């Protein structure tokens, strides 16, 4: 057996051991530990809205991120057991309204038990390209068409192509970190 063959077999053996360690580590992460870890991943607070054949609906989410700028696309994650899930799935349009620091009350309204019909009585709303409700004084609003969805675990991931954007300058973002609302502050 050549040195190269021995080295290759040794590397393959090590890779096999690493894969096993990775599988064991993955299997040891429970839901509570994952959620605790995710609470330390600061994120913007968004009110996600829709309107269409299935009706008007909205919820609060931090599970939003950009995918690509060509074409402008972002993703939104929504639990399939959420009361608003079918409305969003059927409408296939949504608006990601990123809240400003002074709008924590809207996060609580759209994230709580407030009846859907009463949620849109708070804030000032308009529409852009898709007819999904746009919060007029949100930090930024991304008006989107859902172009693809993917089921992962308990959630669907909606891939959303941005059709229109509205910006409000001069405001600070509302963030969620360590299970609390906060504002970002520049450190450099």
From Swiss-Prot:
It comes from the Bacteria. One of its GO terms (biological process) is uracil catabolic process. Keywords: Flavoprotein, FMN, NAD, Oxidoreductase. SMART domains: Flavin_Reduct. It holds the Pfam family Flavin_Reduct. It catalyses: FMNH2 + NAD(+) = FMN + NADH + 2 H(+). GO terms for molecular function: FMN binding; FMN reductase (NADH) activity; FMN reductase [NAD(P)H] activity; riboflavin reductase (NADPH) activity. Its EC number is 1.5.1.42. Catalyzes the reduction of FMN to FMNH2 which is used to reduce pyrimidine by RutA via the Rut pathway. PANTHER family: FLAVIN REDUCTASE (PTHR30466), FMN REDUCTASE (NADH) RUTF (PTHR30466:SF1). Belongs to the non-flavoprotein flavin reductase family. RutF subfamily. This is FMN reductase (NADH) RutF. It comes from Acinetobacter baylyi (strain ATCC 33305 / BD413 / ADP1). The gene is rutF.
